UniProtKB/Swiss-Prot annotation:
GO terms for molecular function: transcription corepressor activity. GO terms for cellular component: beta-catenin-TCF complex; nucleus; transcription regulator complex. The modification Phosphoserine is found at S203, S207, S211, S217, S240, S245, S263, S267, S286, S317, S410. This is Transducin-like enhancer protein 3. The modification Phosphothreonine is found at T259, T312, T319, T321, T328, T334. It comes from Rattus norvegicus (Rat). Residues 1-131 are annotated as: Q domain. Ubiquitinated by XIAP/BIRC4. This ubiquitination does not affect its stability, nuclear localization, or capacity to tetramerize but inhibits its interaction with TCF7L2/TCF4. Ubiquitinated at Lys-712 by UBR5 in response to Wnt signaling, leading to substrate recognition by the segregase p97/VCP and degradation by the proteasome. It comes from the Eukaryota.
Length: 764
C-alpha cells in the first residue's frame, strides 16, 4: 500500500554510528505524519469520487426503474384496450351487411399487422413531437450532468439501433426527461454548478455534502416512489392479517391518520396505486374491539389483561375467506380487475394500469364518443383515457401521474365534502377531463362479465336525491357505539355501547348529555343491535348475551318489560316485522330465531347458515327475510311458508345488508370492502368499490332511491340505488360501526369506534 521509498525506521540504540537526538526524532515523526496525511487525503478524494458515482448510479437506476415500470403498465393497459376493442368490434360486426362485414374484417386484420419499420417510424415521430412540445412550453431542455462512468444519461438514449425495445425505452426516457418540472431544472443547474466548483476543491467532504443535498431534493423522492411501488407489489402478493377479519374483531381505536384518504393531496373516493398504505395498521389489543350493530358480527371482545368476557364462542369462520384469484359464484372477475379481500382492486399492477387514466389524446376515443361526460363512471368507460405514457403532462413522471390520477374524484359526484382533499398534484387539464377518473361502479352480468356503469344524466339530481350531508351534532356515548337507531318522528337517538343503551334528544340543538340510560346485558358485554317498534313505545336490545331485552319506553321511567332467552350465546342483529308482532334475531350459531312479541315466546328458527348470522333485513310487505352470514352466503326466506327461497354464495364474509323499501334490490356489504347490489330475481348485479376496508353497516333511505354504507376505513358513503353513483362521502376519525336513517330521510346517525355517535343532516 505504501511506496518502498518511505522513511526508514530509526536505528536501535547501541548501533555504531548512530547519535540519538530528540529534534531528529521529532522531524522524522513529522515527516511520517505528513506522509500519512497525504495518503489519507488521496484515499478520501477517491472515496468521495466513488460515493458521487454511486449516487449518480442510484439516480439513474431509479429513473430507469420508473421507465420500465411505466412501460410494463402501458403494455398491460394497451393489451387490455385491444381486447376490449376487439370485443366491441365482434359485437358490432354482425349488425353490418355481409359485404361490409368482410371489408371490416379485412381492415381489422390489416390493422393488426404492424411491422418493425412502422413501429420505429411511429416512435421516432413521437419523439420529435415531444421535443417540439417541450421546446415550445419550457424552452430548451436542461441536460443531465455527465455520467461519471461515461454512460449516456437517460434523457438522450440512442435511437440509431433497430431494436424496437430500445426505441420504446428511448422514447419514454427522453420524454420523461424533457417533461421534468422547472423546479427540477433548477435543481439540476444548481447541482452542476456545485459539482464544478467542488471538483476543484481541496476538501472532498464539501463535494459529498453538496451531492447529498442534491440527492435529498430529487433522488430520495424518486426512491420513495420506487419503495411505494415495491410495497404495493408485495402487498398484492399476500393478504395482511390486519385486513383479514375472519374473527370479526374490528379495530375501534383511532386508525392510522396517515391513510391515503386523509392526505390533503388525495380525494376521498377513488381507488389508486398506493391505497393499501395505512390500512394495515390495526391495534388488536384495543380494549373495545367490536363490530357493528345489526350489521356486523363480532366473535370476540378483546380487553387488555382480561380474557374474553362474553360467553360468545370464537366465531372464526371454518371457511377461510379466499383471495379472489379466480372467477367464483358471486364475485365475478375480469382479467386485470382481480380484487383482494380487504384491499382495493387497484392494488393489482394490471388493475391499477387499467384504472389509471393518463391522458385523453388517443385514437381510441371514437367508439365512446356518443357518451356525455356525466354518463361515464370513471376511466374504464372511456378508452380515450388510456393514452401512452409519452402523453403525460409535463409536470409529472410516469409513476407520479399514475398515482396522482388514481385519486381524482369522478366527475359525476356532484358534491365533494372534502375540497381540501382533492388531488392538488394533478394539473387542471388532467383533473377536469371528462370520464378521466377511475371507475368504481361495475355491472356484473349473469356470465360474469364486468363492465363500468354508464350513469344516467339524473344520477345525482332529481327529487329525493340528496346533495350532501352536514354534521350537526356529536353524541359522546363514552364507549364504542356498536348500535344506533332513530325514533319516528325524528326526536330521539338510541346509541348502544358496552352494557347500556343511551337515549339522546336531538331536537334540542347542542345537547351534550343523554336524557336516559338503559342498563342491559352484562356491564362488559356490547350491545350489538337495538330496534324500535313502529309505535316508538318499545325498544328491543340484543348483543353479546343469550338474552334479548324488551324495554317499555312509555312508562315514566323506561323499564324492562320482558326478556327473551335463546340457546345461542350472542345476537348480532335484529329485525322487526312491519306489523310489530314478530322479532327476528341473528344468532351467533347461524340460526335465525323468530320471536312472538305478544306472547314473548320463540315460535321457530330458520336454519341454514353454517356460521354466525351477521345481518338481517325484512321486505317492506313483511313476506320475505334476507340474512347474511359468516359462511359467505346471503339467504332469503319465505316468512309465510317458513322456508329458504334463495342462496347467494360469495368469496367473502357478509357483514351488512339492506333491502330496498321499494323492492327489487338488495345491497350487501362485504369483508372484502366491496358493496354488491343484487336484484331479487335477475342474476346480474352491481359491484361498488369505494370502501377501502370491511363494510360494517348498510341502510337504505326510506324513499329507496339511495342508501348509505359505513366501514372500517372510517368512511360513510352515500350511493344511488341501484347502480351506485357516489352521492356524497364523509370521513370520520375511527371505524364507523353502525348507521341509521330517519323515517323522513332527513337525518343520518352513525356510531363509531371513537366512543361517539355523529348526527348528520341530509341536504337536498
Amino acid at each position: 500500500m505504501y511506496p518502498q521509498g518511505r522513511h526508514p525506521a530509526p536505528h536501535q540504540p547501541g548501533q555504531p554510528g548512530f547519535k540519538f537526538t530528540v529534534a531528529e526524532s521529532c522531524d522524522r515523526i513529522k515527516d511520517e505524519f505528513q506522509f500519512l496525511q497525504a495518503q489519507y487525503h488521496s484515499l478520501k478524494v477517491e472515496y468521495d469520487k466513488l460515493a458521487n458515482e454511486k449516487t449518480e448510479m442510484q439516480r439513474h437506476y431509479v429513473m430507469y426503474y420508473e421507465m420500465s415500470y411505466g412501460l410494463n403498465i402501458e403494455m398491460h393497459k394497451q393489451t387490455e384496450i385491444a381486447k376490449r376493442l376487439n370485443t366491441i368490434l365482434a359485437q358490432i360486426m354482425p349488425f353490418l351487411s355481409q359485404e361490409h362485414q368482410q371489408q371490416v374484417a379485412q381492415a381489422v386484420e390489416r390493422a393488426k399487422q404492424v411491422t418493425m419499420t412502422e413501429l420505429n417510424a411511429i416512435i421516432g415521430q413521437q419523439q420529435l413531437q415531444a421535443q417540439h412540445l417541450s421546446h415550445a412550453t419550457h424552452g430548451p431542455p436542461v441536460q443531465l450532468p455527465p455520467h461519471p462512468s461515461g454512460l449516456q444519461p437517460p434523457g438522450i438514449p440512442p435511437v440509431t439501433g433497430s431494436s424496437s425495445g430500445l426505441l420504446a425505452l428511448g422514447a419514454l426516457g427522453s420524454q420523461a426527461h424533457l417533461a421534468v418540472k422547472d423546479e427540477k431544472n433548477h435543481h439540476e443547474l444548481d447541482h452542476r454548478e456545485r459539482e464544478s466548483s467542488t471538483n476543484n476543491s481541496v476538501s472532498p467532504s464539501e463535494s459529498l455534502r453538496a451531492s447529498e443535498k442534491h440527492r435529498g431534493s430529487a433522488d430520495y423522492s424518486m426512491e420513495a416512489k420506487k419503495r411505494k411501488a415495491e410495497e404495493k407489489d408485495s402487498l398484492s402478493r399476500y393478504d395482511s392479517d390486519g385486513d383479514k377479519s375472519d374473527d370479526l374483531v374490528v379495530d375501534v381505536s383511532n386508525e392510522d391518520p396517515a391513510t391515503p384518504r386523509v392526505s390533503p393531496a388525495h380525494s376521498p373516493p377513488e381507488n389508486g396505486l398506493d391505497k393499501a398504505r395505512g390500512l394495515k395498521k390495526d391495534a388488536p389489543t384495543s380494549p373495545a374491539s367490536v363490530a357493528s350493530s345489526s350489521s356486523t358480527p363480532s366473535s370476540k371482545t378483546k380487553d387488555l389483561g382480561h380474557n374474553d368476557k362474553s360467553s360468545t364462542p370464537g366465531l372464526k369462520s371454518n371457511t377461510p375467506t379466499p383471495r379472489n384469484d379466480a372467477p367464483t359464484p358471486g364475485t365475478s372477475t375480469t382479467p386485470g380487475l382481480r380484487s383482494m379481500p380487504g384491499k382495493p382492486p387497484g392494488m393489482d399492477p394490471i388493475a391499477s394500469a387499467l384504472r389509471t387514466p393518463i391522458s385523453l389524446t388517443s385514437s381510441y376515443a371514437a367508439p365512446f364518443a356518443m357518451m356525455s361526460h356525466h354518463e361515464m363512471n370513471g376511466s374504464l368507460t372511456s378508452p380515450s383515457a388510456y393514452a401512452g405514457l409519452h402523453n403525460i403532462p409535463s409536470q409529472m413522471s410516469a409513476a407520479a401521474a399514475a398515482a396522482a390520477a388514481a385519486y381524482g374524484r369522478s366527475p359525476m359526484v356532484g358534491f365533494d365534502p372534502h375540497p381540501p382533499m382533492r388531488a392538488t398534484g394533478l394539473p387542471s387539464s388532467l383533473a377536469s377531463i371528462p370520464g378521466g377518473k377511475p371507475a368504481y361502479s361495475f355491472h356484473v352480468s349473469a356470465d360474469g362479465q364486468m363492465q363500468p356503469v354508464p350513469f344516467p344524466h339524473d344520477a345525482l339530481a332529481g327529487p329525493g336525491i340528496p346533495r350532501h350531508a352536514r354534521q350537526i351534532n356529536t353524541l359522546s356515548h363514552g364507549e364504542v357505539v356498536c348500535a344506533v337507531t332513530i325514533s319516528n318522528p325524528t326526536r330521539h337517538v338510541y346509541t348502544g355501547g358496552k352494557g347500556c343503551v343511551k337515549i339522546w334528544d336531538i331536537s334540542q340543538p347542542g345537547s351534550k348529555s343523554p336524557i336516559s340510560q338503559l342498563d342491559c346485558l352484562n356491564r362488559d358485554n356490547y350491545i350489538r343491535s337495538c330496534k324500535l317498534l313502529p309505535d316508538g313505545r318499545t325498544l328491543i336490545v340484543g348483543g353479546e348475551a343469550s338474552t334479548l331485552t324488551i324495554w317499555d319506553l312509555a312508562s315514566p321511567t323506561p323499564r324492562i318489560k320482558a326478556e327473551l332467552t335463546s340457546s345461542a350465546p350472542a345476537c348480532y342483529a335484529l329485525a322487526i316485522s312491519p306489523d310489530a308482532k314478530v322479532c327476528f334475531s341473528c344468532c351467533s350459531d347461524g340460526n335465525i330465531a323468530v320471536w312472538d312479541l305478544h306472547n314473548q315466546t320463540l315460535v321457530r328458527q330458520f336454519q341454514g347458515h353454517t356460521d354466525g348470522a351477521s345481518c338481517i333485513d325484512i321486505s317492506h310487505d313483511g313476506t320475505k327475510l334476507w340474512t347474511g352470514g359468516l359462511d359467505n352466503t346471503v339467504r332469503s326466506w319465505d316468512l309465510r311458508e317458513g322456508r329458504q327461497l334463495q342462496q347467494h354464495d360469495f368469496t367473502s364474509q357478509i357483514f351488512s345488508l339492506g333491502y330496498c323499501p321499494t323492492g327489487e334490490w338488495l345491497a350487501v356489504g362485504m369483508e372484502s370492502s366491496n358493496v354488491e347490489v343484487l336484484h331479487h330475481t335477475k342474476p346480474d348485479k352491481y359491484q361498488l368499490h369505494l370502501h377501502e376496508s370491511c363494510v360494517l353497516s348498510l341502510k337504505f333511505a326510506y324513499c329507496g332511491k339511495w342508501f348509505v354504507s359505513t366501514g372500517k376505513d372510517n368512511l360513510l358513503n352515500a350511493w344511488r340505488t341501484p347502480y351506485g353513483a357516489s352521492i356524497f362521502q364523509s370521513k370520520e376519525s375511527s371505524s364507523v360501526l353502525s348507521c341509521d336513517i330517519s323515517a323522513d330521510d332527513k337525518y343520518i346517525v352513525t356510531g363509531s369506534g371513537d366512543k361517539k355517535a355523529t348526527v348528520y343532516e341530509v341536504i337536498y
